[in-house]
Swiss-Prot record:
Pfam family, one: POR
Disruption phenotype: CoA-dependent KG oxidoreductase activity is absent in a mutant strain deleted for both genes korA and korB, and this strain is impaired for aerobic growth in the absence of sufficient amounts of CO(2). Inhibition of the glyoxylate shunt or exclusion of exogenous fatty acids alleviates this growth defect. Simultaneous disruption of korAB and kgd results in strict dependence upon the glyoxylate shunt for growth.
Enzyme category, top tier: oxidoreductase
Name under which the protein is recorded: 2-oxoglutarate oxidoreductase subunit KorA
GO BP terms in the entry: response to oxidative stress; tricarboxylic acid cycle
Domain of life: Bacteria
EC number, UniProt record: 1.2.7.3
Other remarks in the entry: Is extremely stable under aerobic conditions.
Keywords, comma-separated and alphabetical: Oxidoreductase, Tricarboxylic acid cycle
Gene Ontology CC, one term: peptidoglycan-based cell wall
Keyword Manganese in record: no
Biological or metabolic pathway of the protein: Carbohydrate metabolism; tricarboxylic acid cycle
Disordered: annotated segments: 1-21
Amino acid sequence: MDPNGSGAGPESHDAAFHAAPDRQRLENVVIRFAGDSGDGMQLTGDRFTSEAALFGNDLATQPNYPAEIRAPAGTLPGVSSFQIQIADYDILTAGDRPDVLVAMNPAALKANIGDLPLGGMVIVNSDEFTKRNLTKVGYVTNPLESGELSDYVVHTVAMTTLTLGAVEAIGASKKDGQRAKNMFALGLLSWMYGRELEHSEAFIREKFARKPEIAEANVLALKAGWNYGETTEAFGTTYEIPPATLPPGEYRQISGNTALAYGIVVAGQLAGLPVVLGSYPITPASDILHELSKHKNFNVVTFQAEDEIGGICAALGAAYGGALGVTSTSGPGISLKSEALGLGVMTELPLLVIDVQRGGPSTGLPTKTEQADLLQALYGRNGESPVAVLAPRSPADCFETALEAVRIAVSYHTPVILLSDGAIANGSEPWRIPDVNALPPIKHTFAKPGEPFQPYARDRETLARQFAIPGTPGLEHRIGGLEAANGSGDISYEPTNHDLMVRLRQAKIDGIHVPDLEVDDPTGDAELLLIGWGSSYGPIGEACRRARRRGTKVAHAHLRYLNPFPANLGEVLRRYPKVVAPELNLGQLAQVLRGKYLVDVQSVTKVKGVSFLADEIGRFIRAALAGRLAELEQDKTLVARLSAATAGAGANG
């Protein structure tokens, strides 16, 4: 979708007089803000997102952070971006490619221009296109003057100069003025898409309430951006994207990490249990710790541990004491927590472990997304150590998935791993706020004094063991990492007992009640099923929509429950002649499905630290139906081998 209505065009220039711009109605637009990590692109994108949410658009966002805390200014490694799609209909992704690119410097332009379709709009801060900044990123000539951007609609705006002029009246320093240029960009885009500034101004004044001079500078920059759009001839068109028709209810914008935190708080209330989070800060999971720390009034306790092991052990101790124990981490942290997680399996304590996956292995790509921890979640502990594993499909779905994970942990007395990922954690979308009073309670029972009690006596239906809070008179007992005797919990090395307890722990997980897998197959006779999990939901769903509009029959199923699987999963897989599993790993789900159900599930893999594009999934659909999918996957390995640097050849050998 071209927001400019006229395809490619020349660079625009200010005119001496102003004519009222044309107003064009659009169904959707994808905008990407890009600049240095210190340019405030995440804040700019977040505020534009809030404006869209208040306006009533459906939306989806995808931030992209540099891995360095602060890379050298003006360099490619330091580019930070924020992409948002807003629409007047239900959308599933933040968009494949931007229609509008806001580039605050040459590095931002160079890093992102390749994603912009021909005819797309580029709005650049021309003040930053100095010879020094151009040289930093390898531009020999200024692309704003050389004609290499002639395939795009380019608007050069001296944002820094105009911002400094706007704040001069209040005597703001040059440094403070330069820092406010992102608000100029926000004001300009708000004018272009008909968004009022009232809420952004209120946000700025609240955020900088203790520094009123900073607040005033940012407000002036915001209004200067709006006024520039109003008074310049450079932008001949403004755009209108009407509100979306969504199911009735009260909505708010929410990120995946925030939704997880809210879900945990509500789950604690529904279960009548205090929540204790033991966690060590790690990208991209730290926001869960930060958000939960704000909710002490809901009986939430947060503990920032000295390391990953301390975090999970504190949560496990809290679970032993009768609380809802929670720990959060990312991939490397899960590796460190594995022994304590095994202790949780052996002691059968209710524990929620959140893994916000990122690129690995080891430190890997801390700020990039991946889905490569599935096998670790399923099997990454010594011995037969089964746990329940769930995965949300979107930021808003994190709330429901957290509730379900806690329900399983408490009802079945088991650790549960919740697999989010960087794309879900940092992305955002509208979330319909639920009526908490209408949510079903999370049931659990504590043993009571005077009643028969054995720590490893089990509920006949769930196989959950009896649970007594330590210190309850008459219910003294012991549990630990050594094998326990069936019923009494006494330490036992007896072979038959160990065999029994291993099978009971496995049967408990296998017997967890999960709903049947739903399949999106409008015609009921598709030849191809795409099966996914986690954040691939949006790209797969959007690709299926596009394919169906072209007359292709394709079905989509998405797994929330990864252990145990839905009971009807095998039947669903066998229903379709062709089954493809797109994953941000090297085929982990496909490997599990092939082994368990003996179905020829083909893999579509991507490990670039970024999410699938719907266009990519569309190509995979066409290749699968044409019988060429295996060739595409083999080609990826071949290209990797041919591209490998070899001894004596250098990095590009």
